[in-house]
Amino acid sequence: MGVTLEGQRKESIWVLMRRQRARRALVKKIMIRPRKSVEASRRPCRAIHRRVKTLKELVPNTKTSEGLDGLFRQTADYILALEMKVKVMQTMVQVLTETNCV
């Protein structure tokens, strides 16, 4: 630090730059969230892949489906087919119970 003619302190440019750098580091530390590790960012992806794999095991003939769109379409078709089978079975039960009672 130097002294001017008027007796006031004159700070060196290097001291000012060091303070500014320290302030920036502090602001950066406060304002920017720490980044998650690569492993943490892959966890949701792994969970999705595990669920897709489970869905492929549950729905028949999905090994050859084209992407998630095809898998979801085949799953929806499979659910509709199962619903129709349930309705047919319910109708058969009603018909058979009515004929046995009469």
UniProtKB/Swiss-Prot annotation:
Transcription factor that modulates the balance between cellular proliferation and differentiation in root growth. Does not act through cytokinin and auxin signaling, but by repressing peroxidase expression in the elongation zone. This is Transcription factor UPBEAT1. Keywords: Differentiation, DNA-binding, Nucleus, Transcription, Transcription regulation. Disruption phenotype: Enlargment of the meristem and longer root length. It comes from the Eukaryota. It comes from Arabidopsis thaliana. Transmembrane segments: none annotated. One of its GO terms (biological process) is regulation of root development.
